[in-house]
Regions:
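A short, well-structured edge-of-sheet supersecondary motif
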Residues: 1-22, 52, 91-92
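Active-site SXXK
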Residues: 10, 28-54, 127-132, 229
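Short, glycine/proline-biased beta-turn/loop segments that scaffold the active-site neighborhood
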Residues: 51-66, 150
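Short, surface-exposed loop or secondary-structure junction motifs
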Residues: 66-258
């Protein structure tokens, strides 16, 4: 099944659904969840509670392990941290202590800030831990209070998502060969390695995983809810009038709006 939604000026103006989806069905947002967690950092930065120019270790001392003391909050938000495939599993992510212990053991693949590469899951575990640290509350609660509660929406990430019907993740089709992806993207240097196995995606069907609120891909939402969240972000003065542009790569000239 599938849903679609189109929003403008703060309202959903068109939506529909296909297959076995209904208007009430929630789908796993996967990486669209990242935007919720990153956007929650905006008011924390604006208030001074979180400083993007400070090292992550300023807020999470354990993170400094194995030479990561100079990784900045900004590096993590721009996916320049240098630890894209660092490990983090259910046994660690269940508690703050477990997350911090795992982060302490991570090692860098390159010098932070020197290149940009997609961090499939772990960068947003760092952001989630930062949110919890500077607010003293579970990051899932802060995401809801910042983004979804003002819209009158139920939480899209965290323990309460299991209260609504959620469409199970299904495996369909096969990954195209790297050569086909390169043809579409314009070169092999744009093709990311396939690092997320099918089992890692299907784990989102487990109630315990949904309750955990995986910040890099564990949100559950209807299409209209996602559209409304982005409408709210577009309306925030800090986003509409104070966006700073940073070229994240001198070679591909990709602009990151923050």
């Amino acid at each position: 099944g599938a849903q679609f939604a189109l929003a403008r000026n703060g309202s959903v103006i068109a939506e529909g659904y296909f297959g076995d989806a209904t208007p009430d069905t929630r789908f796993c947002m996967f990486s669209a969840t990242k935007a919720l967690v990153s956007a929650t950092c905006i008011p924390l930065i604006e208030s001074g509670a979180l400083d993007p120019s400070r090292p992550v270790a300023h807020y999470i001392p354990e993170f400094a392990g194995n030479g990561k003391d100079h990784v900045l909050v900004e590096h993590v938000m721009l996916m320049q941290g240098g630890f894209p495939y660092a490990p983090m599993g259910p046994k660690q992510w269940a508690t703050s202590e477990g997350r911090r212990e795992r982060m302490a053991g991570w090692r860098l693949d390159w010098e932070p800030g020197t290149r940009c590469a997609y961090h499939p899951m772990v960068a947003h575990w760092v952001l989630a831990e930062l949110i919890s640290t500077v607010t003293g509350r579970p990051y899932t609660d802060v995401v809801h209070e910042t983004l979804t509660a003002p819209l009158g929406l139920a939480p899209l990430i965290g323990p309460t998502v299991v209260e609504d019907p959620c469409h199970d993740v299904r495996a369909t089709g096969e990954r195209p060969p790297d050569s086909a992806i390169a043809e579409v993207l314009g070169g092999m240097h744009y093709v990311m390695p396939s690092t997320i196995a099918l089992d890692a995606l299907l784990v989102m069907n487990r109630p315990a995983t949904r309750i955990a609120g995986v910040p890099g891909g564990g949100g559950f939402a209807r299409a209209g809810e996602i559209a409304l969240v982005y409408q709210r972000l577009l309306a925030l003065p800090a986003v509409a009038f104070e966006v700073r542009n940073r070229m994240v790569s001198d070679t591909d000239n990709v602009v990151a709006n923050r």
